[in-house]
Amino acid sequence: MVIVFVVSFLCIEEMRTLSISSRTFPRIEASIPFKADVISWMGIFLFWMSIVSHSGISICSCMGGVESLPFLISKERCNSTKKLNCRLVWP
């Protein structure tokens, strides 16, 4: 978990550096936004996953109605909700 946190922090820092350099050097601005977006979302995703895995919460997807979207729930509750045809998405 510590490794995931460090990697996500470095990704977010890299995004900040890229956004600063794009303001300082407008000529290279065209190639930077995509890279900055990918790095920032990767950092945010890794940071979020480290929190989720540490707290023991799982991503559960249930078919039917509003519950067809994935949502955060405990693994035991996801497995016990058989009537909605629930399954674990992660982990």
Swiss-Prot record:
Name the UniProt record assigns to this protein: Uncharacterized protein AF_2188
Taxonomic lineage: Archaea, Methanobacteriati, Methanobacteriota, Archaeoglobi, Archaeoglobales
